[in-house]
């Protein structure tokens, strides 16, 4: 199929013959790509936007297009709904806006007011969504496309608590090479003395050409760079602006107006149910001896730094459902939302729930689609949702890696009956305790779920791991590895008894795994299970790849560098016990770190 070249629309901006030819060439190249990935072709006006930003250099414009697409994909900037929370509040916060005046060259003026930014109250990807949304509104204008953008970073009245280094890096990276606008200059106004250190870090990332466009100014110096007619009153200008109400003008009359880039970005997101497991052997897998050498070479600090590389990557996807006002009370922690692309959806039932939301994510296992459901420790107001999920997903095994309370803080609710023969009713589902077995490191409870609507009963095995310390990670992985085997064996036995797997009637049901937030110990447990499964089958594994891929399905999985390093240690401990490496010398260096 040949790519179609988008026709020049009647209302398109006036271009020179050379610019029109460059636009046709750009569209021809880009639409070869859109045909390949079966997405809609790019329009003429969108093409012009990217070409304007690179002065109609076709190759540089193509590079910008892919940088922009990839940045939006990584930051989850897709299907924006500016009339819905939390994006609406972020837009209307006034921390970022576009002035209604231009500089003498015709450039649009964007203003970021640092004192209005509170990192501890904001979700970074929502801040970036608002930034993208408002910048997109600015570059919809042909005049802005042609004449560029001036960016003012107003630090007057701000303090260190208003500053976020990681956000600053992302904004500058965006402006310098991932957004279709000509960046004329960046004016940093009223910077405190402490700003010199973080700015020196940020400036190292910039090319000389971009660095030359950044100027740090006192408030009294701004009028030497822009006339007063272009500046707000607090910067010595004449523009009257109420930051609390100014951005209302940028909200569309209809929510969620079509964005041609949504389709182009979404094709690269992992679909919730259609692909095979993301955990398949990759090109950079290590043998166990290579892993020993790798950990000894990098040492503990190096592995911690490796985790930071993973942590810095923002989730691939969106959190609209988690952040919807009606669902916020169903999240145990406000900063642990659930990806829309992989979330478990409940069946809406009359009198039970008005939403299909639960903070739970499908997660792949080694060469197995949806092997786990990673979820938070149930809250009292989500007990019924939890058991509905267990029933609807035909779950046979539940793994709990926390206690009800740790360190004096509530970590999970008591969502199942603790004593033999006791029962709890959750709507039309009644859960009965058939028996409890207390082991050294875990407790095993056999539960029966009775669906009174369907008049069916099922057995579920509940495991609670008890040897994870209140703080940090276990000193040895031995008990967790043994526990992992017990869980695997129980799942295999339950599936075999169910008979569905051998008859091919349905895929193996997922194991529900939870801790408190559903990302730290849950991610550690699942990562270890995946890595050991691959090691046992192929003799190779890749921890970095496993955790990175896991976070595309259960965002923020593995919360700390300590948990990440524990995965490496646990694998080496397992390998030594199984005789995969000689005990002693090779592992002594690892253990002594």
From Swiss-Prot:
PANTHER family linked to this entry: RECEPTOR-TYPE TYROSINE-PROTEIN PHOSPHATASE (PTHR19134), TYROSINE-PROTEIN PHOSPHATASE NON-RECEPTOR TYPE 9 (PTHR19134:SF285)
Residues involved in substrate binding: 470, 515-521, 559
Domain spans labelled CRAL-TRIO: 84-243
GO CC aspect terms: cytoplasm; neuron projection terminus; nucleoplasm
Species assigned in the record: Homo sapiens (Human)
Subcellular location per the Swiss-Prot or TrEMBL entry: Cytoplasm
Protein name, UniProt field: Tyrosine-protein phosphatase non-receptor type 9
UniProt GO BP: negative regulation of neuron projection development; peptidyl-tyrosine dephosphorylation; positive regulation of protein localization to plasma membrane; protein dephosphorylation; signal transduction
GO MF: non-membrane spanning protein tyrosine phosphatase activity; protein tyrosine phosphatase activity
Active site per the UniProt annotation: 515 (phosphocysteine intermediate)
InterPro entries (UniProt xref): CRAL-TRIO_dom, CRAL-TRIO_dom_sf, CRAL/TRIO_N_dom, CRAL/TRIO_N_dom_sf, Prot-tyrosine_phosphatase-like, Protein-Tyr_Phosphatase, PTP_cat, Tyr_Pase_AS
Gene3D superfamilies in the cross-refs: CRAL-TRIO lipid binding domain (3.40.525.10), N-terminal domain of phosphatidylinositol transfer protein sec14p (1.10.8.20), Protein tyrosine phosphatase superfamily (3.90.190.10)
UniProt record similarity statement: Belongs to the protein-tyrosine phosphatase family. Non-receptor class 3 subfamily.
Residues covered by the Tyrosine-protein phosphatase domain: 303-574
Phylogenetic classification of the source organism: Eukaryota, Metazoa, Chordata, Craniata, Vertebrata
E.C. designation(s): 3.1.3.48
Pfam families: CRAL_TRIO (PF00650), Y_phosphatase (PF00102)
Keywords: Acetylation, Cytoplasm, Hydrolase, Protein phosphatase
